[in-house]
Amino acid sequence: MKKLTCFKAYDIRGKLGEELNEDIAWRIGRAYGEFLKPKTIVLGGDVRLTSETLKLALAKGLQDAGVDVLDIGMSGTEEIYFATFHLGVDGGIEVTASHNPMDYNGMKLVREGARPISGDTGLRDVQRLAEANDFPPVDETKRGRYQQINLRDAYVDHLFGYINVKNLTPLKLVINSGNGAAGPVVDAIEARFKALGAPVELIKVHNTPDGNFPNGIPNPLLPECRDDTRNAVIKHGADMGIAFDGDFDRCFLFDEKGQFIEGYYIVGLLAEAFLEKNPGAKIIHDPRLSWNTVDVVTAAGGTPVMSKTGHAFIKERMRKEDAIYGGEMSAHHYFRDFAYCDSGMIPWLLVAELVCLKDKTLGELVRDRMAAFPASGEINSKLAQPVEAINRVEQHFSREALAVDRTDGISMTFADWRFNLRTSNTEPVVRLNVESRGDVPLMEARTRTLLTLLNE
C-alpha cells in the first residue's frame, strides 16, 4: 500500500503527476464518499490548468460511491463553504493549490455546515481508505448524479448582507485578482454596486482568470507580489488597494498611499466594526501578535478570546464561544454568519464601509494602532534543531518574563514587549513574531536578540 504524500495536516496538496493525479483524485472522491456516506456534495475548482480534470475525476469517485455531485464551476474556496451551508448539503470539496507553485494542486474538504475536515476530524480516515484503494464494486443502480449549478448571485447577496450600501460615499478601489478565481466575483460585485447606485469605482488589475498566471503566482503576503497593486493605487489616486491569493480566501489591503497594511492591524479594524454593531460580542484572535487586538476589543466593550493558530482551531473555538468574528495576522478572517468560515471578500467590503462611516482614510484608521503596537512581522528561520533552539530562547528569558503561554508554541510577555515563537505545521521552519508597546527601537533590538539566540 503506497502512502499518499499529498495528505497534509489540514488539507491535500501535492506535486502534479508524482503526488496528485486523476487516479488519486478519483480515489480521494471514492474514499470521501465511503467514509462520510454523504447524499449530496458540492464541488468547485480554482483557475489552475489541472483543476477541472482533477475535479471531474473527484466527481467520478464520489458518484461511484453513490454520492450526488453539484458542480459550481470555477470558484474560490469560500464559494464552496457558502454553497455547502446555503444549500444545506452534506459537504464540499474545492480543488485548489492557493498560492503554491504552478506544478502543484490540492483540495480543501468540508463536511455538513462547512465544518473543516482536517487531520483529526476525518482527513486521516479519508487518507487511509484512499491509500488502501480497496473499494467495493460500483453499484450502477446507486451511482450518484452529476449536475452543474450557478450560485454566484446568491453568494453576492450574502456578501452584501454584511454592509449597508447607503453608508458608502464616493470611493475608488484598486482590486488585484492576480489572474485567479476572484475576477468573476469582482465583476459580479461591481455589477451589484452599479445596480444599487453605490458610488464605488473599481479599478481592476489582472482580473482575467488565467491558470498560466502570466503575472506570477498571486501571493501578496510576499513583498515581491505587491508592486502591481501599490503602483495602481498611486497611479489612479485610489482610496484603497485590495489584492487576493489564487483562491481568494485571504484578502490583503493597501492604504491610499499604496502602503501594505499588515493583516494584524486589519483584525483590530474588523473587530471594531463588528463591535459597533454587536456590543459585547466575543472576538477570536491568534497568539502570534495580540496586544493591539486585545486593546481594541476591550476598549470597544468586547471580549477577546485567544485560539491556537490555524483555520480548524479558530473555527472550532468560534463555535464554542459563539464569537461573531475571528482574525489571524496571516490575512484569514472568519465570520459567524459565514458558517464560522474564512472569507476574502467580506473583509474589504467591511473596511470600505468603515472608511466611509469614519470619514477617514485607511492609513488614518490604522496609523495610531501601528504606532501603539509596532510589530516585527513574521520572521521565518530554517533550523536544524528547532526544539532545542526554542528551549534555548525560553531559558534565556525565563527569569525576566512576566507571563508564559503555550497556546501555540511559546509566547513570553514582558512589561513593554512580547514575542511568540512556534514551529510551522506545514514547513520545516520556526516562526517568530515580536511586538512592543509603542517602542520601535525596543522591538527591533529584542528581535535581533531572539534571532541571534535561535541561530546559535
UniProtKB/Swiss-Prot annotation:
GO biological process, one term: GDP-mannose biosynthetic process
Gene3D superfamilies: Alpha-D-Glucose-1,6-Bisphosphate, subunit A, domain 3, Alpha-D-phosphohexomutase, C-terminal domain
Database matches in InterPro entries: A-D-PHexomutase_a/b/a-I (IPR005844), A-D-PHexomutase_a/b/a-I/II/III (IPR016055), A-D-PHexomutase_a/b/a-II (IPR005845), A-D-PHexomutase_a/b/a-III (IPR005846), A-D-PHexomutase_C (IPR005843), A-D-PHexomutase_C_sf (IPR036900), A-D-PHexomutase_CS (IPR016066), Alpha-D-phosphohexomutase_SF (IPR005841)
Catalytic activity of the protein: alpha-D-mannose 1-phosphate = D-mannose 6-phosphate
Assigned keywords, A-Z: Capsule biogenesis/degradation, Isomerase, Lipopolysaccharide biosynthesis, Magnesium, Metal-binding, Phosphoprotein
Catalytic residues in the record: S98
Database matches in CDD domains: PMM_PGM
Top-level lineage group: Bacteria
Cofactor note: Binds 1 Mg(2+) ion per subunit.
Spans traversing the lipid bilayer: none
Function: Involved in the biosynthesis of the capsular polysaccharide colanic acid.
Full protein name: Phosphomannomutase
Organism encoding this protein: Escherichia coli (strain K12)
Phylogenetic placement of the source organism: Bacteria, Pseudomonadati, Pseudomonadota, Gammaproteobacteria, Enterobacterales
